[in-house]
Amino acid sequence: MGDTNFDQLLSDYRRAIDAWVAAIEAEEALANDDHSMVEMEKWDAAGLAVHDAEALAKKARDRYKSALRKKNYGF
């Protein structure tokens, strides 16, 4: 466990969170007064991007937390 790079894991987690926030903001920007099907589809696609970014952020968080648990608790 001595070779685990906690700074890198934390950095990966923070980048993933930033990407998730950016995806949320992009989705939010598409919620507008244009009620056309095209705009709705763009909004839906942005929602899928939010879902994907959330999944990546949670995986990065889990990798970081798992490494910390192994270091601090031995499991």
Model-based region annotation:
Residues 31-42, 58-75:
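Long amphipathic alpha-helical coiled-coil segments
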